[in-house]
C-alpha cells in the first residue's frame, strides 16, 4: 500500500450507505476517495461521486467495472450484498487490494471465502463498524462471564423496513460474544423464533427477537434477566454516518498490513482491555 493517503473505492456508491461512505472518505485526513462503483446499467454511472453524495465535485466518476478502477484504489469498502461482495473479494485477492467488509448475511461458505482470502490480503470484516457497538460487545463479554451462567439471556434488535437479513449481523455478533465468554458455540444454544406452545424457557439458551419497521437505523439490546433484577445493555444508532466513519477509519488502519483477517475490535485495540 502507498505511504501517502490511502485511496479507497466505495461499492454501491449510489445507495444510502454508499453515499455516506463517500462523505466519510472525503472528510477523514489521510484518506483519499479513489473510485466509486455501481452496478452495470445504473442511471448513476458517469456521475461525480462527490456530487452524488452531496459533498461537492471530486472528479471521481461512478464506474461499473472493477478493471477500470483497479489502479485507482488501495482498499475496497463494501457494504452491499453477499454475492456481490464475494465477487469483489475475488478481484481484490487477485490484485492485492485490502478490503473493509460491512456486508452482512453471509452463509458459512461465504465466511470461509473471506477467511481464505485473508491469507493473501488484509481484510477488516465486522458486523458493525460503530465504535459504540464494539465497546458494547466487549461489555457483553464481561457481563456474560459474571452473570451468564444463571440469567436468561435475550437479544432484541430493530432495523428499518428495507433490511433483508435477520437477525442482524450485529445481533449475531452479540450472541457470539456472549456464547464465547460462556465457552459455548452459538449454534448450539441460539433460539431464533418462538411460536405456539413452546413450553418453558430452556436454561442456557440465548434468545433472539427481531423488529423491522419504518426508518430505524439500528437498535440492539442484550438482556440478562434473573428473578428480581435484570441488566440491559443497549446501543442505538441515529445515523449511518457512525458506521461509515468506522469503516473509513478501518481502511486507514489497514495501511501497511499485507494480509490477515481483522475486525473492528482490532482497529480500536479493544482486545487488550
Swiss-Prot record:
Cytoplasm found in the keyword field: yes
Binding site for (S)-2,3,4,5-tetrahydrodipicolinate: 160, 169-170
Keywords, sorted A to Z: Amino-acid biosynthesis, Cytoplasm, Diaminopimelate biosynthesis, Lysine biosynthesis, NAD, NADP, Oxidoreductase
GO biological process terms, semicolon-separated: diaminopimelate biosynthetic process; lysine biosynthetic process via diaminopimelate
EC number, as in UniProt: 1.17.1.8
UniProt: NADP(+) binding residues: 39
Biological or metabolic pathway of the protein: Amino-acid biosynthesis; L-lysine biosynthesis via DAP pathway; (S)-tetrahydrodipicolinate from L-aspartate: step 4/4
Gene Ontology molecular function, alphabetical: 4-hydroxy-tetrahydrodipicolinate reductase; NAD binding; NADP binding; oxidoreductase activity, acting on CH or CH2 groups, NAD or NADP as acceptor
Catalyzed chemical reaction(s): (S)-2,3,4,5-tetrahydrodipicolinate + NAD(+) + H2O = (2S,4S)-4-hydroxy-2,3,4,5-tetrahydrodipicolinate + NADH + H(+); (S)-2,3,4,5-tetrahydrodipicolinate + NADP(+) + H2O = (2S,4S)-4-hydroxy-2,3,4,5-tetrahydrodipicolinate + NADPH + H(+)
Family the entry assigns: Belongs to the DapB family.
HAMAP family, per database record: DapB
Task performed by this protein: Catalyzes the conversion of 4-hydroxy-tetrahydrodipicolinate (HTPA) to tetrahydrodipicolinate.
Protein name in UniProt: 4-hydroxy-tetrahydrodipicolinate reductase
Classification of source organism: Bacteria, Pseudomonadati, Pseudomonadota, Gammaproteobacteria, Enterobacterales
Amino acid at each position: 500500500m502507498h505511504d501517502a493517503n490511502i485511496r479507497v473505492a466505495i461499492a454501491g456508491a449510489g445507495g444510502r450507505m454508499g453515499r455516506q461512505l463517500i462523505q466519510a472518505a472525503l472528510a477523514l485526513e489521510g484518506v483519499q476517495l479513489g473510485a466509486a462503483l455501481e452496478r452495470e446499467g445504473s442511471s448513476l454511472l458517469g456521475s461525480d461521486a462527490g456530487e452524488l453524495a452531496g459533498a461537492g465535485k471530486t472528479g471521481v466518476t461512478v464506474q461499473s467495472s472493477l478493471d477500470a478502477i483497479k489502479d485507482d484504489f488501495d482498499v475496497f469498502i463494501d457494504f452491499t450484498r453477499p454475492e456481490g461482495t464475494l465477487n469483489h473479494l475475488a478481484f481484490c485477492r487477485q490484485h492485492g487490494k485490502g478490503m473493509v467488509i460491512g456486508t452482512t448475511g453471509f452463509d458459512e461458505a461465504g465466511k470461509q471465502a473471506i477467511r481464505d482470502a485473508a491469507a493473501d490480503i488484509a481484510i477488516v470484516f465486522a458486523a458493525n463498524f460503530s465504535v459504540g457497538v464494539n465497546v458494547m460487545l466487549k461489555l457483553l463479554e464481561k457481563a456474560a462471564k459474571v452473570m451468564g451462567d444463571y440469567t436468561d439471556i435475550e437479544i432484541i434488535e430493530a432495523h428499518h423496513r428495507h433490511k433483508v437479513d435477520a437477525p442482524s449481523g450485529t445481533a449475531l455478533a452479540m450472541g457470539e460474544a456472549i456464547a464465547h465468554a460462556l465457552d459455548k458455540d452459538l449454534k448450539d444454544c441460539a433460539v431464533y423464533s418462538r411460536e405456539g406452545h413452546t413450553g418453558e424457557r430452556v436454561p442456557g439458551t440465548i434468545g433472539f427477537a427481531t423488529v423491522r419497521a419504518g426508518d430505524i437505523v439500528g437498535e440492539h439490546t442484550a438482556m440478562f434477566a434473573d428473578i428480581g433484577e435484570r441488566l440491559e445493555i443497549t446501543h442505538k444508532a441515529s445515523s449511518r454516518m457512525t458506521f461509515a466513519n468506522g469503516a473509513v477509519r478501518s481502511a486507514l488502519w489497514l495501511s501497511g498490513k499485507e494480509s490477515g483477517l481483522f475486525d473492528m475490535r482490532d482497529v480500536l485495540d479493544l482486545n487488550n482491555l
